UniProtKB/Swiss-Prot annotation:
Residues 381-546 are annotated as: Required for DNA-binding and interaction with NFKBIA. Belongs to the peptidase M14 family. This is Adipocyte enhancer-binding protein 1. Residues 77-101, 262-282, 327-362 have a biased composition (Basic and acidic residues). It comes from Mus musculus (Mouse). One of its GO terms (molecular function) is metallocarboxypeptidase activity. Phosphorylated by MAPK1 in vitro. Induction: By TGF-beta. Expression is also induced by a high fat diet. The gene is Aebp1. One of its GO terms (biological process) is regulation of collagen fibril organization. Disruption phenotype: Two independent knockout mice have been generated for the gene encoding this protein, and these exhibit different phenotypes. Mice lacking exons 7-12 exhibit reduced growth rate and body weight and resistance to dietary-induced obesity. Individual adipocytes from these animals are hypoproliferative while the adipose tissue is prone to apoptosis. Mice lacking exons 7-16 die perinatally from gastroschisis, in which abdominal viscera are extruded through the ventral body wall. Surviving mice exhibit deficient wound healing, having dermal fibroblasts with reduced proliferative capacity. Residues 374-531 form the F5/8 type C domain. Residues 932-1128 are annotated as: Required for transcriptional repression. SUPFAM superfamilies: Carboxypeptidase regulatory domain-like, Galactose-binding domain-like, Zn-dependent exopeptidases.
Length: 1128
């Protein structure tokens, strides 16, 4: 019976084939006709049970049973790809359940011979089709799979040519499939299930699964003609060998395969496959897919993600995103094909054209690249924007080591055991200790900077710590690394700041540091990095400053500074000029900017003002403020700001942003928060510029003790000691350049900008040792319970009141300097809330810039300390500019307060180096080369005196008003004979000249000595006259200095008592108008040869001794005559 049945089945199949021509399969039979035909066969086979045995006999082929299973795993993922004949068997199952497609399958069977030859090229195309779905998930898998599958396809193609055999096997398989659903009668319900799920296993028996899988796929392969997919594990192993950078993307949700089945895409990819096959095949030749056998149950990999996360499944909801993903998936496949590279981004193709594999990896890296870390500025621990009451701690070792001392770069006082030490230190090290900062607003914290204790004795610092956050200071959340509290590593020494960044920012209001381990005692200083999240509310609205000036708010290197000054000069060429003071020890130029209506020239009556900064290289705020001031003055002058225009037109302003460029370059390498207190402070040679000037205080005070001032030692413009002028003197290169610059320009007022404190310091900076009288007076005052200011007065300058006025003018205009609640930056507030302090009382030191400027020149110099943070963050520059802008302008305007004028003689010729002194102030000023002077004075009435050598002094009363604007006080001096008198005294060795009384009788010896003395004086007068004539005749021809002419070889001329040596020439002496008379007594006795000067002096001494004896000599007659000398 079995042969009869098989024969009947074959006949039925042949009948179906004849009814379905190859060209038009769908036009011959409809779905209803096919169903009726199949139901007829099923009805015949329902009562027969041996078909299962036949099935077992027909099923000896193991490959079709295994491959359909593999196709199940890969079918969902490779819905777009044409599957080889084995895989088509699985799709036949799908078709059979979809009764309509069954008709198409047999029709396609007729086309098998035509499709089989075509399957070889599609094999290459099939591989790319498998790639796109995987590419959608992870494009890296596409190329490797394409290379692996081509190897399996050629052998499968050889099996296909036997079309007859396949027809013979397909017929019994189809009949068996029809027999199985009939007993249960769920065919109508189960067929749609097969459509949704291409791998039905639940409703079939264990033996039937293999049979159905082997039988059903054979009519369907002609429909889809897709290659079978390899085992998923085999594919992964092969991909690992091919390219380690490819990311596996095998999992996909079950509904996606239906969406991916884009049939029109197959022909497009087929043409591209051969090229890819050639490129990828060589590395895959030695690789063979592992065989797991029929019993191996393939797990469901659709829900698993290997090694890498895959974001694409999150995007399929949006249609546009899915389309973009598809386009991106196609790009990696089309790398090898030149015609389709045009669709890709030109820049990416050009960048990665030589590296196809890495290029895909780079695309994925861009997708998964972490967001750039937010860089936040300090919240203000070091700059004291965080107030003391915003910092708390679990405990403190003593009052001087409280939480408020835990600021970054906090400096200890001179006595480390006082109330101002250099860190926060905990009391009990056994308990959990912490220090907390309240930002008073929601803040995004990004890091913490820690530092050890500032001490010359102790070596204390924290090595590891935890970090916690809170919004209410009650509930704290520790920062973790995902599974435990994250440990941050701190310092390895006590001075170097160390940054500990948070891997991910945390938004909170409070932050705590929990030290874990430490060296020495538990002490630390810190700064917190954070960005405000919430807007500024009422509390900060009073303190926040927003600038409206369009300036360059950033830190400038040496090159940037030079470029900025050049840009300002080009923008305002009529009022600016850039020049150099000299060079540093490393050869960097010290640049200066002059701002005036006539740059480059000193105008008569126009005062000169200077701002200097960067004396210490790590004190950067002053440097940036002067660069901002340059830009501001230029912009406002061009915009017509009347205040700035008046200042520029009436003042010659000099701005030097960096006096120590070498030190700045050292400090800038570490940045604003990571340089310690002293890094970059000194020059390259190791000098502190501020304290490297000649010590003139000691010279002046020693002269005052000897009562030599102002007769032998002046009280102003003291000369520099010789030991500082020698080439071997230990003076820095920068100081030499600064002194030369100060002597060339007649500065009136100046200030040097520093950092580390918030105050204004004025001279003296050197502490003067009190005298015995002052110490005694202080002791008596203390015994009586009174305050004696004798010692404090010893530290004050004669212009103490004027210095205080100038200091207050800057501090009062500063927005934060005079706020008493802020206190001192490092220790107690020495200013008592006024923002000004005497340098000797605050920080005594010798040889400072301020003292030297006051004693050696006419310039009143002050030191301005701009803030607690020497090197503020770039984000704080706008705020600091607004805090200091008004103060900088106000202080410059003070140069026009006091008196000014010009000193000339009666002919209107200016007198240089004339001294202007004010009664009550034991310090004068000198006139400039043009005879003009400026004297800063407080409002009031003053008696001013002008005197110069060779001129008669002149005095007048000058009034100074409160308004800005100096009072004009000019002086005209008349010539005096003091110059000639000094010359005569010099001729006599600066000894008193003896005058002989004519009525007194003289001995012959006295008369002889008198004659010799007179002759000697006449000869010296002639030599002086000849010397002056030589000096005024013109420059000497020889480079050697002119020597004194030797005595005249002509014989001495004997003069009668009434004769006078006639003048040989009438030159410049005739222009002199003043004369004086000298009474000379001449004896009638004649003398022969002249005596030497030594002999005359010896005889004069003998004569004095004889006169002391009181002996009487014979009387002789004498004559008296007058000699008139021109005043030279």
């Amino acid at each position: 019976m079995a042969p009869v049945r098989t024969a009947s089945l074959l006949c039925g199949l042949l009948a179906l084939l004849t009814l379905c021509p190859e060209g038009n399969p769908q036009t011959v039979l409809t779905d209803d006709e096919i169903e009726e035909f199949l139901e007829g066969f099923l009805s015949e086979l329902e009562t027969q049970s041996p078909p299962r045995e036949d099935d077992v006999e027909v099923q000896p082929l193991p490959e079709p049973t295994q491959r359909p299973r593999k196709s199940k795993a890969g079918g969902k993922q490779r819905a777009d790809v044409e599957v080889p004949p084995e895989k088509n068997k699985d799709k036949e199952k799908k078709g059979k359940k979809d009764k309509g497609p069954k008709a198409t399958k047999p029709l396609e069977g007729s086309t098998r011979p035509t499709k089989k030859p075509k399957e070889k090229p599609p094999k290459a195309t099939k591989k790319p089709k498998e790639k796109p779905p995987k590419a959608t998930k992870k494009p890296k898998e596409k190329p490797p799979k394409a290379t692996k599958k081509p190897k399996e396809k050629p052998p499968k193609a050889t099996k296909r040519p036997s079309a007859g055999k396949k027809f013979s096997t397909v017929a019994p398989l189809e009949t068996l499939d029809r027999l199985l659903p009939s007993p249960s009668n769920p065919s109508a319900q189960e067929l749609p299930q097969k459509r949704d799920t291409p791998f039905p296993n639940a409703w079939q028996g264990q033996g039937e699964e293999t049979q159905v899988e082997a039988k059903q796929p054979r009519p369907e392969p002609e429909e889809e003609t897709e290659m079978p997919t390899l085992d998923y594990n085999d594919q992964i192993e092969k991909e690992d060998y091919e390219d380690f950078e490819y990311i596996r993307r095998q999992k996909q949700p079950r509904p996606t395969p239906s969406r991916r089945r884009l049939w029109p895409e197959r022909p497009e990819e087929k043409t591209e496959e051969p090229e890819e096959r050639k490129e990828v095949e060589p590395p895959l030749k030695p690789l063979l897919p592992p065989d797991y056998g029929d019993s191996y149950v393939i797990p469901n990999y659709d829900d698993l993600d290997y090694y890498f996360p895959h974001p694409p499944p999150q995007k399929p909801d949006v249609g546009q995103e899915v389309d973009e993903e598809k386009e991106e998936m196609k790009k990696p496949k089309k790398e090898g094909s030149s015609p389709k590279e045009d669709t890709e981004d030109k820049w990416t193709v050009e960048k990665n054209k030589d590296h196809k594999g890495p290029r895909k990896g780079e695309e994925l890296e861009e997708e998964w690249a972490p967001v750039e870390k937010i860089k936040c500025p300090p919240i203000g621990m070091e700059s004291h924007r965080i107030e003391d009451n915003q910092i708390r701690a679990s405990s403190m070792l003593r009052h001087g080591l409280g939480a408020q001392r835990g600021r970054l770069n906090m400096q200890a006082g001179a006595n480390e055991d006082d109330y101002y030490d250099g860190a926060w230190c905990a009391e009990d090290e056994s308990q959990t200790q912490w220090i907390e900062v309240d930002t008073r607003r929601t803040t995004r914290f990004t890091g913490v900077i820690t530092q050890g204790r500032d001490s010359s004795i102790h070596d204390d610092f924290v090595t590891t710590f935890f970090v916690g956050f809170s919004n209410d200071s009650q509930t704290w959340v520790m920062y973790t690394n995902g599974y435990e509290e994250m440990t941050f590593y701190g310092n390895v020494d006590k001075d170097t700041p160390v940054l500990s960044e948070l891997p991910e920012p945390v938004v909170a209001r409070f932050i705590r540091i929990y030290p874990l381990t430490w060296n020495g005692s538990l002490c630390m200083r810190l700064e917190v990095l954070g960005c405000p999240v919430t807007p500024v509310y009422s509390y900060y609205a009073q303190n926040e400053v927003v600038t409206t000036d369009s300036l360059d708010f950033r830190h400038h290197s040496y090159k940037d500074m030079r470029q900025l000054m050049k840009a300002v000069n080009e923008e305002c060429p009529t009022i600016t000029r850039t020049y150099s003071l000299g060079k540093s020890s490393r050869g960097l130029k010290i640049y200066a900017m002059e701002i005036s209506d006539n740059p480059g020239d000193h105008e008569l009556g126009e005062p000169e003002f200077r701002y200097t900064a960067g004396i210490h290289g790590n004190e950067v705020l002053g440097r940036e403020l002067l660069l901002l001031l340059m830009q501001y003055l230029c912009q406002e002058y061009r915009d017509g700001n009347p205040r700035v225009r008046n200042l520029v037109q009436d003042t010659r302003i000099h701005l030097v942003p960096s006096l120590n460029p070498d030190g700045y370059e050292v400090a800038a390498q570490m940045g604003s928060e990571f340089g310690n207190w002293a890094l970059g402070l000194w020059t390259e040679e190791g000098f502190d510029i501020f304290e490297d000037f000649p010590d003139l205080n000691s010279v002046l005070w020693a002269a005052e003790e000897k009562k030599w001032v102002p007769y032998r030692v002046p009280n102003n413009n003291l000369p520099i000691p010789e030991r500082y002028l020698s080439p071997d003197a230990t003076v820095s290169t920068e100081v030499r350049a600064i002194i030369s610059w100060m002597e060339k320009n007649p500065f009136v007022l100046g200030a040097n900008l520093n950092g580390g404190e918030r105050l204004v310091s004025y001279p003296y900076d050197m502490a003067r040792t009190p005298s015995q009288e002052q110490l005694l007076a202080e002791a008596l005052a203390a015994a009586r319970g009174e305050d004696d200011d004798g010692v404090s007065e010893a530290q004050e300058t004669p212009d103490h009141a004027i210095f205080r006025w100038l200091a207050i003018s800057f501090a009062s205009a500063h927005l934060t300097m005079t706020e008493p609640y802020r206190g001192g930056c490092q220790a107690q507030d020495y200013t008592s809330g006024m923002g000004i302090v005497n340098g000797a009382k605050w920080n005594p030191r010798s040889g400072t810039f301020n003292d030297f400027s006051y004693l050696h020149t006419n310039c009143l110099e002050l030191s301005v300390y701009l803030g607690c943070d020497k090197f503020p963050h770039e984000s704080e520059l706008p705020r600091e500019w607004e805090n200091n802008k008004e103060a900088l302008l106000t202080f410059m305007e003070q140069v026009h307060r006091g008196i000014k004028g010009v000193v000339t003689d009666e002919q209107g010729i200016p007198i240089a180096n004339a001294t202007i002194s004010v009664s009550g102030i034991n310090h004068g000023v000198k006139t400039a080369s043009g005879g003009d002077y400026w004297r800063i004075l407080n409002p009031g009435e003053y008696r001013v005196t002008a005197h110069a050598e060779g001129y008669t002094s002149s005095a007048k009363i000058c009034n100074v008003d409160y308004d800005i604007g100096a009072t004009q006080c000019n002086f005209i001096l008349a010539r005096s004979n003091w110059k000639r008198i000094r010359e005569i005294l010099a001729m006599n060795g600066n000894r008193p000249i003896l005058r002989v009384d004519p009525s007194r009788p003289m001995t012959p010896q006295q008369r002889r000595m008198q004659q010799r003395r007179l002759q000697y004086r006449l000869r010296m007068r002639e030599q002086m006259r000849l010397r002056r004539l030589n000096s005024t005749a013109g420059p000497a021809t020889s480079p050697t200095p002119a020597l004194m002419p030797p005595p005249s070889p002509t014989p001495a001329i004997t003069l009668r008592p009434w004769e006078v040596l006639p003048t040989t020439t009438a030159g410049w002496e005739e222009s002199e108008t003043e004369t004086y008379t000298e009474v000379v007594t001449e004896f009638e006795t004649e003398y022969g040869t002249d005596l030497e000067v030594e002999e005359i002096e010896e005889e004069e001494e003998e004569e004095e001794e004889e006169m002391d004896t009181g002996l009487t000599f014979p009387l002789t007659t004498v004559e008296t005559y007058t000699v008139n000398f021109g005043d030279f």
